[in-house]
Amino acid sequence: HVKAIPGADPELVERMGYLADRMSVNLELPTAEGLRTLAPNKHRKNILTPMRQIQNGIHANKEELILYRKSPVFVSGGQSTQMIIGATPETDYQILNVAENLYQKFELKRVFYSAFVKVNEDKSLPALPGGPPLLREHRLYQADWLLRFYGFKAEELLDEKRPFFNVMLDPKEDWAVRHLECFPVEINRA
């Protein structure tokens, strides 16, 4: 697994793609606003450009492999990214929408979520009186699973009126409680 650095030389990204089974470019924060606030030297375009290059490389390589079976494989395991959760004010709904868009537009295999942990006393970093939002991170992983493997859409799980998960309920359980009209289910037809 290789992490491509935003703004990396495209030639290096391509060369690494033939050596690594997976590549990732960390999105860092869910929105461009959050990035401007906490990492003003980083720009969304510099993050998305290598993501697009990796996606295009995977597609081109699939075509090469059809024509030339012995061609080297480019990023066989696909690409992923990571977002820090809780450092900026994005809602779970916004975060899931970002993840959903990344899956659709960049064909990512996985989005990783990392609860923000304050490691120094920089005044620009938010104070988290309750500590890192680990349970929130866990609920986002569970919701992400619903997006990737069960075909849910972010808007089916959350919306503008209800933008955060109830951290006391698994998102699947939360959805079921809000959609009692779908139950009971005949197990042989489910």
Predicted features along the sequence, with ranges:
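Conserved AdoMet/S-adenosylmethionine-binding subsite of the radical SAM
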Residues: H1-L157
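Long, charged amphipathic helices and adjacent flexible linkers at domain junctions
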Residues: L158-D174
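Helix-hairpin-helix
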Residues: K172, R178-A190
